[in-house]
Amino acid sequence: MRVLAAMSGGVDSAVAAARAVDAGHDVTGVHLALSRSPESDRTGARGCCTIEDARDARRAADILGIPFYVWDLADRFETDVIEEFVESYAAGRTPNPCVRCNERIKFAAVLDKALALGFEAVVTGHHARLDPDGTLRRSVDPDKDQSYVLGTLRPEQLAAARFPLGDSTKAQVRVEAAERRLAVADKPDSHDICFISHGDTGGWLRERLGPRPGPVIDATTGQTLGHHDGAYAFTVGQRRGLKLGRPAADGRPRYVLDISPVTSTVTVGPAEALDVRRLVADRAVWPHEGAVSCLAQVRAHGGVVPAVAQARDEELVVTLTTPVRGTAAGQAVVLYDGDRVLGGGHIRTTGG
């Protein structure tokens, strides 16, 4: 099979490409240039698609003896991931850019181009498993499982995907990389949002959106507890950095409950007010009929809770048997039957 291996410059994608070669496939490596920021060209820079990442990917391809190319998808990434990220925060939502990148870049822009060039599949270093029938499952490594950020992919996207690492732990991948003499064997994992390398999401958004001051209101008393420079810098469930000028009347900690972009108002309240028992998701991938008992996951590294999911018109309604705390519109909800992904969508509204 002629396959395209997406090589980020990290250890996972390098070993995934190596395993594709071992499986007898005709493999070509490609590194995605997703940023035109001058910072990404600086030696030692961190973040999205730095020059060092491209070099690491090329070195790995050379060791594997496969052709290697760099594809410039910066404009597409800006439009489909970064702009959507900014617009979501400006609208009071909390997006997951990794989910969006998989939906629109790796398994849309890259996959479409790969198929047009005659490749039959795209290989990535995601920690997830795919059955021959296209069923997506969790990785055997629960700490590194990435099925959540893949859980909103459509069946036709999964049909052309290959995840060679799903049956291995991250420790095993690193050992294998060292045995193959890949220089990235000990390269640290990336944890930040890739295009916000310094980790200050609020500051990065402020540069894009400018100051939009407003009040911080207590939901219990209606009192103004403080002021902020931009509601977009907050997320539902946040406790730290609320800029409260006075304590709440009951003396208890306060958490962000709601964000109103129209009035630039941030509403805070006690922790129990964050409990969510019902989610409505759109842009859903849900091929099931009727009410389905399942397990729901609403964060990339969160746990699961029992739920019942049912399609309603173009929406997916998820009722949680056990409430989850601090779930925000914009996040993904992915639904499981054991380790099997049933489908998912993007949370539009939540309810207590």
From Swiss-Prot:
GO terms for cellular component: cytoplasm. Keywords: ATP-binding, Cytoplasm, Disulfide bond, Nucleotide-binding, RNA-binding, Transferase, tRNA processing, tRNA-binding. One of its GO terms (molecular function) is tRNA-uridine 2-sulfurtransferase activity. InterPro entries: MnmA-like (IPR004506), MnmA-like_C (IPR046885), MnmA-like_central (IPR046884), MnmA-like_central_sf (IPR023382), Rossmann-like_a/b/a_fold (IPR014729). The record marks 126, 331 as: Interaction with tRNA. SUPFAM superfamilies: Adenine nucleotide alpha hydrolases-like. The active site is at 101 (nucleophile), 194 (cysteine persulfide intermediate). It is an enzyme of class 2 (transferase). CDD domains: MnmA_TRMU-like (cd01998). Its EC number is 2.8.1.13. Belongs to the MnmA/TRMU family. This is tRNA-specific 2-thiouridylase MnmA. It comes from Frankia casuarinae (strain DSM 45818 / CECT 9043 / HFP020203 / CcI3).
